[in-house]
Design a protein with these regions (language model features):
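Cytoplasmic membrane-interface "Motif A"-like loop-to-helix N-cap segments
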Residues: 74-87, 293-308
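Helix-loop boundary and gating motifs at the non-cytosolic
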Residues: 1-64, 232-275
């Protein structure tokens, strides 16, 4: 690894430890459990379930504005732009700690969570350009895997600490949040020290794309044009949509059912939905990173997607049998899948994107994540609420729908991987040339 890359890596490693003190508060599973428990009895149950569903899916659907972040950061220094987003997020998370336990407080808390997640989505989108510039393809997955390991372990421990504190006294929330915001400033400082390799060249390429009329736009039609031009990437996005939709449908539904059917409080809910999956990610990240460094992301997803299908199947069985042990098992398998998902989600688009369009490809990717995140909570919780009025085992059928959707995505990756093999074989075949014309 070049000296500049090693220097950047050290600062990113520092940030990966300290920024979770900020992120833990708006981690979708953690904040969903907090809201479900804290506002139970304050508002009507069905309304609370839908608010929890939206908050729990906020990490995904906040990405719907990513194309706007790509446009706003175009032709601008990326690191200072990211620092601005981090500071805005600190302010919003700090406000969450002062929300009253009332209907109005619930809505204000939800608004702060959504705005904070919008800021984090911008950070993730722009960070992909920095990773592409700073880390070469052969080491990129391993480097980002190590960063992800530090982040998720810190998040897992913070989630457990928050759950234990709030089971003891819910008012700890008002002390821990401002404290976490202060600690996270170290992560903001660390990011401010990162240097972008090829910064001048990248800005020149972005300026040239603006002059050629090929710059990112606020108009979502630009996303459609990109997908039309890159059909293989469009196929990848279609399969990701199905797999991701099935996954995103599960978390809001699980948060609701852990409380309503399994009677878990803060600690139990956070363990199943967040801490256990996060703690398992470092186990699988090194293995997934080695695979992703060797193969195209389509071939990677062809294997990896089935782990998500298995996890969804175990959760469905847990609901059918009302067995808590299966919930823990599903959380373990889900965490193993998340390890690979964290790598491929952040890096997969780089197997398709030219250097100066990395943020644009990432913008398309995360915007579509936002679209499915907007659909998923209403689809799963809405299906459960509708079935609960008619049948006894509504939770089983609702999770069965999640399982089937994940399965369709995994099958799609099998088809796409075979198509990619055919394309590679065709491009490797020597082109036929016409025989020379004899001169009479």
């Amino acid at each position: 690894m070049p000296a500049l890359a090693r220097r950047n890596y050290r600062y990113e490693l520092t940030a990966a430890f300290f920024l979770p003190f900020l992120l833990a508060v708006v981690d979708s599973a953690i904040i969903g459990v907090v809201v479900k428990n804290a506002y139970e009895g304050v508002v009507e149950d069905t309304l609370l379930n839908f608010v929890v569903a939206v908050i729990t899916a906020s990490a995904a659907f906040s990405n719907i504005v990513s194309f706007a972040w790509v446009r706003l950061s175009h032709r601008r220094d990326k690191v200072p732009f990211i620092n601005g987003l981090q500071i805005a997020m600190i302010v919003l998370v700090g406000l969450i700690g002062f929300m009253p336990r009332s209907g109005a407080g619930m809505w204000a808390l939800a608004a702060c969570v959504l705005l904070a997640r919008f800021c984090w989505a911008g950070f993730i989108t722009i960070r992909s350009t920095i990773w592409r510039q700073n880390y070469s393809r052969p080491v990129r997955a391993r480097v980002t895997g190590k960063l992800a390991t530090v982040q998720v372990l810190t998040l897992a421990l913070l989630g457990l600490g928050l759950g234990a504190s709030m089971d003891a006294d819910p008012q700890w929330f008002r002390v821990l949040l401002p404290g976490g915001c202060v600690i996270s400033l170290v992560g903001v400082w660390a990011w401010s020290r990162i240097r972008l390799r090829g910064r001048a060249s990248l800005l020149q390429q972005e300026a040239a794309s603006s002059e050629n009329g090929d710059a990112p736009s606020f108009n979502p039609a630009g996303m459609v044009r990109l997908l039309a031009r890159d059909r293989l990437f469009a196929g990848y996005m279609a399969c990701m949509f199905l797999l991701g939709l099935g996954n995103l449908m599960q978390t809001p539904l699980l948060v609701v059912l852990l409380r309503d059917e399994f009677k878990m409080e803060y600690m139990g809910g956070i363990q199943v939905t967040s801490s256990i999956p996060l703690a398992m990610m470092p186990v699988s990240i090194p293995l997934w990173a080695r695979l992703l460094d060797r193969v195209h992301v389509i071939q990677f997803r062809r294997i990896h997607s089935w782990v998500f299908v298995i996890a969804a199947g175990i959760t469905t069985l847990a609901m059918y049998s009302h067995t808590s042990a299966l919930l823990w098992a599903a959380a373990v398998v889900q965490g193993l899948a998340f390890g690979g998902g964290a790598l491929a989600w952040n890096l997969g688009h780089l197997d398709f994107a030219p250097a100066h369009r990395a943020s644009e490809y990432m913008g398309v990717h995360v915007t579509l994540t936002g679209v499915r995140g907007l659909i998923a909570p209403f689809l799963s919780v809405g299906l459960y609420e509708a079935l609960a009025e008619r049948i006894d085992n509504a939770s089983t059928w609702a999770f069965g729908a999640c399982f089937a959707t994940c399965g369709l995505g995994a099958i799609g990756f099998q088809v796409l991987a075979r198509h990619k093999v055919r394309l590679d074989a065709a491009s490797a075949r020597p082109a036929e040339t016409a025989p020379p014309t004899r001169v009479e």
